[in-house]
UniProtKB/Swiss-Prot annotation:
<dbReference type="GO" id="GO:0043022">
    <property type="term" value="F:ribosome binding"/>
</dbReference>
<feature type="binding site">
    <location>
        <begin position="9"/>
        <end position="16"/>
    </location>
    <ligand>
        <name>GTP 1</name>
    </ligand>
</feature>
<feature type="domain" description="EngA-type G 1">
    <location>
        <begin position="3"/>
        <end position="166"/>
    </location>
</feature>
<dbReference type="GO" id="GO:0005525">
    <property type="term" value="F:GTP binding"/>
</dbReference>
<feature type="binding site">
    <location>
        <begin position="271"/>
        <end position="275"/>
    </location>
    <ligand>
        <name>GTP 2</name>
    </ligand>
</feature>
<keyword id="KW-0342">GTP-binding</keyword>
<feature type="binding site">
    <location>
        <begin position="336"/>
        <end position="339"/>
    </location>
    <ligand>
        <name>GTP 2</name>
    </ligand>
</feature>
<keyword id="KW-0547">Nucleotide-binding</keyword>
<dbReference type="GO" id="GO:0042254">
    <property type="term" value="P:ribosome biogenesis"/>
</dbReference>
<dbReference type="Pfam" id="PF01926">
    <property type="entry name" value="MMR_HSR1"/>
</dbReference>
<dbReference type="InterPro" id="IPR032859">
    <property type="entry name" value="KH_dom-like"/>
</dbReference>
<feature type="binding site">
    <location>
        <begin position="118"/>
        <end position="121"/>
    </location>
    <ligand>
        <name>GTP 1</name>
    </ligand>
</feature>
<comment type="function">
    <text>GTPase that plays an essential role in the late steps of ribosome biogenesis.</text>
</comment>
<keyword id="KW-0690">Ribosome biogenesis</keyword>
<dbReference type="InterPro" id="IPR031166">
    <property type="entry name" value="G_ENGA"/>
</dbReference>
<dbReference type="InterPro" id="IPR003593">
    <property type="entry name" value="AAA+_ATPase"/>
</dbReference>
<feature type="binding site">
    <location>
        <begin position="224"/>
        <end position="231"/>
    </location>
    <ligand>
        <name>GTP 2</name>
    </ligand>
</feature>
């Protein structure tokens, strides 16, 4: 299962800043005053080759009343959910009584805890951090979350031991970086116009990713808000009353893994607990269910996002959808309870879906009734299609041809008067498909052009139901850092020009 890392500490020590840095988002509000984060926030992160779920919490200072007391409860529950706790302290403010109280609680819970001294930029970090050793929680890691300094080393140190404890299941190698690094070596030695050379590169890259798509057992996670019919859909798919169904939100508390076979294909159905608004999550057991659901998404190959047709799509559905896309999982949207609706209401629901889900037009949408079984059988065609698209193998020569066709139809923009040059593309991984594009000044490409390339690759490769990740790799400049040596003739010409310039100034 995916490790869970909780960020806890006093208010305004930089927990939300670190959360945004780890998840590479701006999901957590950040401001220079305490108490801004009032609830737990979950995010997906991939740092130093490790996939994990990170939880941002409100601050604890021991004087909570009213809403602050609820914030403290959220933080304590996050500690219970986590595999590792990052206890953030303020290096500039030094050790305060609230830090000592939090440390005492963490020792009592016997949680794996790492003390992280934040805001170490611009100060003598070693001397400022020395007093935090009094907390008795081991080494003190020094970071500057706002600048990103020390964050990668922190995660590597924190999750490496955890990966060993969990049989290294969570210590997933970062395929993207390894593919990029290897491609740099090929860049200088091989001709990408030559099919024999590109075949060699494809063979090398295929060895890295072959194991990841070798397993033909397709894992399907059924997720959504409470009481949208996830367990009913699971039972309809299985043809038996395998999971408890009741017309009350929150019946399913844990993720249930159920193996099955259909038309010779092995599947694992994952029925999950409903994910509702954080403000409505009250029971401790339900809070654990949210984590289990997010971990099930990470573990799945294809996710069925189930929506109640009678309630429409909510902000919580969109939040869950964002987590699915960030995790890179294939997606099929299931609109349940479609039976019994009038045609006018059906038209309204379809219009609302088109409006709010226009950014994921690559996903299939199915209108079903899990209770009566209508439309359920067609789901497997979309599941197999999405899985096949997510794991299909493409060659370097094909991706490079598509890249050049895209550049011919719409040239890359000028940057500082120079045209961005896109040299070649190669596969960087599967599930989801990763395309690595090499070129010059590619880091300066506008987001609009990156979206154009993503859509062009999707259309050309006919990828349905799976997100695409495009990585940009700057080409090696053999002359970078080297001083230009002039020939004797060039030196004499330079001297004559300098004399001419000096005379013209007089």
């Amino acid at each position: 299962m995916t490790p869970v890392v909780a960020l806890v500490g006093r208010p305004n020590v930089g927990k939300s800043t670190l959360f945004n840095r780890l998840t590479r988002t701006r999901d957590a509000l950040v401001a220079d005053f305490p108490g801004l984060t009032r609830d737990r926030k979950y995010g997906h992160a991939n740092i130093a080759g490790y996939d994990f779920i990170v939880i941002d919490t409100g601050g604890i200072d021991g004087t909570e009343e009213g809403v602050e007391e609820k914030m403290a409860e959220q933080s304590l529950l996050a500690i219970e959910e986590a595999d590792v706790v990052l206890f953030l302290v303020d290096a500039r403010a030094g050790l305060v009584p609230a830090d000592i109280g939090i440390a005492q609680y963490l020792r009592q819970r016997e949680k794996t805890t790492v003390v992280v001294a934040n805001k170490t930029d611009g100060i003598d970090a070693d001397s400022h951090c020395a007093e935090f050793y009094q907390l008795g929680l081991g080494e003190v890691e020094q970071i500057a979350a706002a600048q990103g300094r020390g964050v990668t080393q922190l995660i590597d140190q924190v999750l490496a031991p955890l990966g060993e404890q969990l049989n290294a299941d969570q210590a997933v190698e970062n395929e993207e970086n390894s593919a990029n690094e290897e491609a740099d070596e090929w860049d200088t030695d091989f001709d990408f116009e030559n099919e024999d050379d590109t075949a060699l590169l494809d063979e090398a890259l295929e060895e890295e990713t072959e194991e990841s798509i070798e397993d033909k057992n397709i894992k399907i996670a059924i997720v959504g808000r409470p009481n949208v019919g996830k367990s009913t859909l699971t039972n309809r798919i299985l043809g038996e009353e395998r999971v408890v169904v009741y017309d009350m939100p929150g019946t399913t508390r844990d993720s249930i893994y159920i193996p099955m076979e259909r038309d010779g294909q092995q599947y694992t159905i994952i029925d999950t607990a409903g994910v509702r608004k954080r403000g409505k999550v009250n029971l401790a057991v339900e809070k654990f269910s949210v984590i289990k659901t997010l971990q099930a998404i990470q573990d799945a190959n294809v996710v069925l996002l189930t929506i109640d047709a009678r309630e429409g799509i909510s902000d919580q559905d969109l939040s869950l959808l964002g987590f699915i896309l960030n995790a890179g999982r294939s997606l099929v949207i299931v609109v349940n309870k479609w039976d019994g609706l009038s045609q006018d209401i059906k038209d309204q629901v379809k219009s609302e879906l088109d409006r709010r889900l226009d950014f994921i037009d690559f996903a299939r949408v199915h209108f079903i009734s899990a209770l009566h079984g209508s439309g359920v059988g067609n789901l497997f065609d979309s599941v197999k299609e999405a899985y096949a698209c997510a794991t299909q193998k493409t060659s370097t020569s094909m991706l490079t041809r598509i890249l050049r066709m895209a550049a011919d139809e719409h040239q890359p923009p000028l940057v500082n008067g120079r045209r961005v040059k896109l040299k070649y593309a190669h596969p960087g991984g599967y599930n989801p498909p990763i395309i690595v594009i090499h070129g010059n000044q590619v880091e300066k490409l506008a987001d609009s052009y990156k979206r154009y390339l993503s859509n062009y690759f999707r259309k050309s490769l006919k990828i349905i139901g799976s997100p695409i990740r495009i990585q940009f790799q700057e080409g090696n400049n053999p002359f970078a850092g080297k001083k230009n040596k002039l020939t004797p003739n060039q030196l004499r010409k330079r001297k004559r020009l300098m004399k001419f310039i000096k005379k013209s100034k007089k």
